């Protein structure tokens, strides 16, 4: 059993789409999966055919004094979703007023992990330094840092810390881009925790959100879907549920 956190080194690198796709691929491999949206943007639900007007979620429930477990949704017999929930405009503008009220989700997820109900709990983490994000990261057995091969992410890899033991996953890699190829070759020599697979740019990754499906469900024959399935198999082989030792190159 493993808790896996996915976090972009910046916004806009495709973390939410990859989280949904990986959850789908793991359940296709026979695993029981819970996918949790920890981002106040509350977008993960839209990859699982949840209505746009659906406001419920674990954070919304906690802020309203309700049971967060009632916010869970069943997508398939082996894949459950826990949306974040919709914040009001005032809440979005004043996160310091409510973030400290969400810490109980960590003990709740610990209990779910201990129950053995799921083989995997995937958490879509925001790119921020909030207390709840740090608490959820500390709960994770493993973490993936999602990057695009560009100068922005290259700079960030050198000036901001990654979670301890995080592996780096490249998304949206473009064949024929000279600058991407140059940066990628540099990373192959300098980034010891770069995953041995990457996700190429694929129109299906853009289309699947419009279709409100994970990419592997929307188009299982797409290149990105096949690469995410390879990632899922890698996770099965390498993430046993024990925390990745800090400094490990595996």
From Swiss-Prot:
Its main location: cytoplasm. One of its GO terms (molecular function) is ATP binding. Induction: Part of the yhjR-bcsQABZC operon. Expressed at low levels in mid-log phase, expression increases as cells enter stationary phase, the increase in stationary phase is dependent on rpoS. In K12 strains the premature stop codon in position 8 has polar effects on downstream genes, decreasing their expression about 10-fold. Keywords: ATP-binding, Cytoplasm, Nucleotide-binding. The keyword Nucleotide-binding applies. Changing residue 15 to Q: Does not alter cellulose production. Belongs to the BcsQ family. PANTHER family: CELLULOSE BIOSYNTHESIS PROTEIN BCSQ-RELATED (PTHR43384:SF4), SEPTUM SITE-DETERMINING PROTEIN MIND HOMOLOG, CHLOROPLASTIC-RELATED (PTHR43384). This is Cellulose biosynthesis protein BcsQ. The lineage of its organism: Bacteria, Pseudomonadati, Pseudomonadota, Gammaproteobacteria, Enterobacterales. The gene is bcsQ.
